[in-house]
Amino acid sequence: MRDCKVGLDFGTTFSTVSTLVNNSMYVLRLGDSAYIPTCIAITPGGEAIIGGAAEVLSGDDTPHCFFYDLKRWVGVDDNTFKFAMNKIRPKYVAELVEGEVYLTGINKGFSIKLSVKQLIKAYIETIVRLLASSYSLRVIDLNQSVPADYKNAQRLAARSVLKALSFPCRRIINEPSAAAVYCVSRYPNYNYFLVYDFGGGTFDVSLIGKYKSYVTVIDTEGDSFLGGRDIDKSIEDYLVGKYNIKKVIPATYLALIKEECNNTNKSIFTILFDDGSVQVVEFSKSELEKCVRPFVERSIKLINDVVVRNKLTSGVIYMVGGSSLLQPVQDMVRSYASTKGLTLVADQDMRSAVSYGCSVLHKLEDNKEIVYIDCNSHPLSDISFNCDPEPIIRKPMSIPYTHTVKMRHDRPLKTIVNIYEGSNLFMPENDWLISSNINTTDFAKVGEEYSKVYEYDIDGIITLKIRNEVTGKMFTLPNSFTKSDNIKPITFKLTQLSNTDDLATLTSLLGYHDKNFERFYGLFNVPTILIKEIDKLGGFKTLYRRLKSMNANF
């Protein structure tokens, strides 16, 4: 069994997991797709089933509780819960329990309430274990992506989940930064990359610069509530108004209408509602463009902020994320690029680029092929004496970064250090990150010098410390807002099969009917070769149709 270091793009609607082993990229495929729906079904027996298999699972045959929207709840707390509820408008129960969001999923014969952290942990454990079992690998490290616009609370929540996994995590990487690592290796002739990451629920843009072996994130912008889900909702509202539909259009049909309208000339669609009723609708490419336009315009405004701020006149806009596949999105961004002297690249791997970048970064850093430097997403300010906000970490700033403020202990003082994250000029509208009580006599004698030390780590997490400049002793200040990062342990069973397991089962069944398939039995322990040999015969779907023709039970 070979060791592997994994790259995970944990997305709002779809996730992708990959690993680079001996310069070959291995990707988990479920249902013949590398884009695994970010949803999970939990059964009464404790089985966890993810992706498309969870979406189509019948409640009559297998009672379960169905969860989705996991990423949209990351880092939501008492201060942001109402805002998140208004944005997400969940069709399931979401509630705060001691400052943490718990979800009660869609009841399909079974109901259970779990924390968002428990659900995300179960999903990540399952998707990574399926990758490992597919290629007979042992996971020894993980890089996971997060939206560049994530604030400290969201990054802390993400890191607490990763710390609880059964395998180690190296780092959290901003999604556009991960994509940039991949595209820098694919397009070495460019020095500046604007990574346009339009996903299912979030939008990010990052400006990446390359100089020799240095790859640095220069600037970033984003919106944690702008993505494909907004386009789906716009399509739903449009169809409801056009046909006076009184029922909720299932999300799967909205996604299907959007995808087929974009990729084919089809304009007539049939919607099957949850109650079994049917509605035929007409939806054209021009109507798709009308629904998409407002959201792309919002994304272009964010791109332009980065372009203008950095006086960018050359480079490439590299499109990433599932929503970037939409033709109206590409057309509008291409039109914008032409006005700024930029080149648009819509790569065939745009949906996988973030995961691939996370995987590639392991190798590049291990071999010291590049020096990768990220930057912060939001400025930080300290509300000190007289309630005057003092910027301590501007945006953009290369991270990790340490800011030191030297002070002299002239007299004993009791005060509070308050740190806010955000760029709103009205400071209370920003995120209140840290509130620490300080008694200066705890850290220095009268007459001694001491320093406030603000540490911003590679994952975007801030820590406040006091250093006595005479003794050199460092004190980490407790944060009154700190929440426990412990996740209530709950163990789920992995009963789901990977594509490789499916192929082995299918080949065994075919071998019963046709002895020619017995030659594949010896390949069950070398899954990559098995997959290649089966692909030569037309792939899983072709062989499955062949089995159905041999046995009516299939």
From Swiss-Prot:
Broad class of where this protein is predominantly found: virion
Cellular component terms (Gene Ontology): virion component
Keywords recorded for this protein, A-Z: ATP-binding, Chaperone, Nucleotide-binding, Virion
Location within or outside the cell: Virion
Entry superkingdom: Viruses
Signal peptide limits: none
GO molecular function, one term: ATP-dependent protein folding chaperone
Disulfide bonds: none
UniProt keyword annotation of Nucleotide-binding present: yes
Nuclease keyword on record: no
PROSITE patterns: HSP70_2
Family annotation (Pfam families): HSP70
Sequence similarity: Belongs to the heat shock protein 70 family.
Function summary: Transports viral genome to neighboring plant cells directly through plasmosdesmata, without any budding. The movement protein allows efficient cell to cell propagation, by bypassing the host cell wall barrier. Two movement proteins, p6, Hsp70h and three structural proteins, CP, CPm, and P64 are essential for cell-cell movement. Also plays a role in virion formation. Together with CPm and p64, encapsidates the 5'-terminal portion of the viral genome.
Name under which the protein is recorded: Movement protein Hsp70h
Organism: Lettuce infectious yellows virus (isolate United States/92)
Organism placement in taxonomy: Viruses, Riboviria, Orthornavirae, Kitrinoviricota, Alsuviricetes
